[in-house]
């Protein structure tokens, strides 16, 4: 038998073995939870007299809830969604990412990363 034949036989045996997959429990954010977070952020903005654009996303960065309060510039909508998406996907605040860039970590200067303060991961 050739080395190739032995290798194929070993590979076939390995592929037929049962796999013990490890699983993790992931908490899903539903619409009710997203609205609760949105309202809490809105209340905080009102207390600080700082109208805001507020976005809540799931762990993949997909939008679940959004509100642009009166007096907020239209461009803030895209910024808020980008900050939320970045914080969710990287599981760190966008302030931390902005600080990393300011310290020279240019790897964070890529498409689809919004490195402006204001995004917080939901934990």
Please identify what each model-predicted range represents.
Residues 1-2:
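N-terminal secretory signal peptides that target proteins for export/translocation
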Residues 21-123:
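Flexible, solvent-exposed loop/hinge segments and secondary-structure transition points
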């Amino acid at each position: 038998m050739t080395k190739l034949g032995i290798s194929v036989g070993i590979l076939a045996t390995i592929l037929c073995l049962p796999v013990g997959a490890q699983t993790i429990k992931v908490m899903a954010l539903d619409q009710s939870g997203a609205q609760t977070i949105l309202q809490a952020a809105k209340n905080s903005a009102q207390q600080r007299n700082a109208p805001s654009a507020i976005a809540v996303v799931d762990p993949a960065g997909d939008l679940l809830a959004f509100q642009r309060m009166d007096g907020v510039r239209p461009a803030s909508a895209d910024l808020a969604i980008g900050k939320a998406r970045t914080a969710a996907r990287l599981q760190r605040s966008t302030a931390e990412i902005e600080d990393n860039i300011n310290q020279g970590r240019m790897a964070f200067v890529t498409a689809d990363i919004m490195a402006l303060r204001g995004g917080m991961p939901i934990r």
